[in-house]
């Protein structure tokens, strides 16, 4: 079975070039620090590992995935919460993580103007949907071991 990855390196390079050109500040967060996703900023993981989870209405935490290296953490959380009434939680799992912090308004304005960034966002959502569907197929079609293996895959 072919492994599905987030987005192509070329698209990621375009996002990094934009962030560096605009001189977007880099935040350095320490292990077990949580990000506040209710503010008006977007976070792009540059280095490190973060855990993405959802806080359900009854306050249980449901772990979704771990993200490593370059990834738009806020887009991933937007994917998760678009159709659910739950709150995303992002926690730093590496010793330190470096994240770009940009205003959502500024980012989406730039996405509308730049075809490369628009392509990145579209590809990101499409690939995340493919990954979710593939994991669900493996879980549904297999036993308990298959369910565990689908998340390790």
Each language-model region and where it sits:
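His/acidic/aromatic-lined binding-pocket segments of jelly-roll/cupin-type domains
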Residues: 25-27, 34-36, 40-46, 63-65
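A short beta-turn/loop motif at secondary-structure boundaries
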Residues: 33-37, 139-142
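Glycine- and acidic-residue-biased ligand/ion/polar-headgroup-sensing regions
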Residues: 40-53, 58, 69-71
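Cyclic-nucleotide recognition modules
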Residues: 65-123
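Polybasic "coupling" helices that flank or enter modular domains
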Residues: 115-153
């Amino acid at each position: 079975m072919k492994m599905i990855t987030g987005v192509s390196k070329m698209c990621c390079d375009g996002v990094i070039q934009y962030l560096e050109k605009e001189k977007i500040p880099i935040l350095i967060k320490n292990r077990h620090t949580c990000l506040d996703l209710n503010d008006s900023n977007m976070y792009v993981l540059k280095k490190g590992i973060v855990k993405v989870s959802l806080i359900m209405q009854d306050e249980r935490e449901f772990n979704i995935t771990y993200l490593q290296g370059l990834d738009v953490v806020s887009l991933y959380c937007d994917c998760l919460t678009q159709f659910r009434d739950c709150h995303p939680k992002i926690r730093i799992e590496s010793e330190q993580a470096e994240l770009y912090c940009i205003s959502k308004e500024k980012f989406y304005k730039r996405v509308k103007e730049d075809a490369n960034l628009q392509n990145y966002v579209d590809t990101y959502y499409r690939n995340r949907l493919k990954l979710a569907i593939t994991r669900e197929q493996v879980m549904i079609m297999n036993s308990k071991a298959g369910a565990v293996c689908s998340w390790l895959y």
